[in-house]
Amino acid sequence: MDLCNFYCCYLLKSNRTQSSGAVYIGSTPDPPRRLRQHNGEIVGGASKTKHGRPWSISCLVYGFPNKVSALKFEWNWQNLGISRYTKDCDFRSKKQKTIMYCLKGLKHLVDSDTWRRWPLNITFLNKTAFSKWNQLGKTYGNINVYFDEEWLNGFHEKVIQKTYDHKLCLRKTISEPVKCNLCYECIESDELRANCPFTDCNSINHLTCLASSFLTEECQVLPIEGMCTKCKRVLRWREFLSTVFTTSLETDERDFESENRIEIIDLELEK
């Protein structure tokens, strides 16, 4: 059983020639391996990107609560012209599907009411793409944006193994029945729970109770930040979400790649 639920969406750009403008949007639980597939270094799909090699990752979007959520985001990013979040924003022209077109679509998605409060991260691995992103203005809501050219290096140690070890530790600390620090009711094994991410605080709560306490002064469904009821530290909602799990989790996280991909647009062929 794999306890890590990391799943990201990514934007590729073809580097076949200096002026190549082909782009591709996909999703994966393992970006380094998926990039190798796109570039033909290992087998395993990615046939649609065969003619644009070599490819590089311009940016990744991650922090989704599960694979289904990531795939929903991926579909909307791939289909900006018909997505209900962007269909009124002039994304219908096929010739506009450049790197800037995709970044504008990404900006519209993360600024929408649906995703702006999700604990998402956007990491840029390419300076040019990051510069283009900054031209689009400030990102609102609960989204963090980073630039890190070396993000893929040590991916498994930084993301996969860290998450795996953290969740194993959480399971060990609450293997016995515990009570929610907010409602004082026993937390059942199949209920979502979240604990304070600080190691010197052992606060554990029902996820729903914690969300309600964070939303006492808000009219939204998803909170942004609040105070830990025990250590009194102010924390962002995303920090609590990183600790969420159930003790009865038995989901087998398989390496699943979405079949729905954005159509590759090679601008060189259109010239």
Swiss-Prot record:
Keyword Zinc-finger present in the record's keywords: the answer is yes
Which parts of this protein are zinc fingers (SLX1-type)?
Answer: 180-231
Its Enzyme Commission number? Answer: 3.1.-.-
The terms describing its cellular component in GO are: rDNA protrusion; Slx1-Slx4 complex
Q: What is its main location?
A: nucleus
EC class of the enzyme, as a word: hydrolase
Outcome (variant: R34A): No endonuclease activity. Increases stalled replication forks in the replication fork barrier (RFB) of the rDNA and the amassing of X structures in rqh1 deletion mutant
As for subcellular location, the record says: Nucleus, Nucleolus
Q: What happens when the gene is disrupted?
A: Deletion mutant provokes rDNA contraction. Simultaneous elimination of slx1 and rqh1 is lethal.
Q: Which SUPFAM superfamilies match?
A: GIY-YIG endonuclease (SSF82771)
InterPro entries on file: GIY-YIG_endonuc, GIY-YIG_endonuc_sf, Slx1, SLX1_C, SLX1_endonuclease, Znf_RING/FYVE/PHD
Cysteine pairings via disulfide bonds? none
* Pfam families (UniProt xref): GIY-YIG, SLX1_C
User: Per its UniProt record, what Gene3D superfamilies does this chain match?
Assistant: GIY-YIG endonuclease, Zinc/RING finger domain, C3HC4 (zinc finger)
In what residue span(s) does the GIY-YIG domain sit?
A: 5-87
Signal peptide annotation: none
One GO term under biological process is:
replication fork processing
Q: Which UniProt keywords apply?
A: DNA damage, DNA recombination, DNA repair, Endonuclease, Hydrolase, Metal-binding, Nuclease, Nucleus, Zinc, Zinc-finger
Q: Which GO terms describe its molecular function?
A: 5'-flap endonuclease activity; crossover junction DNA endonuclease activity; double-stranded DNA endonuclease activity; ds/ssDNA junction-specific dsDNA endonuclease activity; zinc ion binding
The entry's free-text remark on the cofactor is: Divalent cation. Mg(2+) is preferred. Has Holliday junction resolvase activity solely in the presence of Mn(2+).
Q: Which family does it belong to?
A: Belongs to the SLX1 family.
Function statement? Catalytic subunit of the slx1-slx4 structure-specific endonuclease that resolves DNA secondary structures generated during DNA repair and recombination. Has endonuclease activity towards branched DNA substrates, introducing single-strand cuts in duplex DNA close to junctions with ss-DNA. Has a preference for stem-loop (SL) and splayed arm Y structures. Introduces a single-strand cut in duplex DNA on the 3' side of a double-strand/single-strand junction with respect to the single-strand moving 3' to 5' away from the junction.
Task: State how it assembles.
Answer: Forms a heterodimer with slx4.
The protein depicted here goes by the name Structure-specific endonuclease subunit slx1
Q: Which organism is it from?
A: Schizosaccharomyces pombe (strain 972 / ATCC 24843)
- In the UniProt record, the gene name given for this protein reads slx1
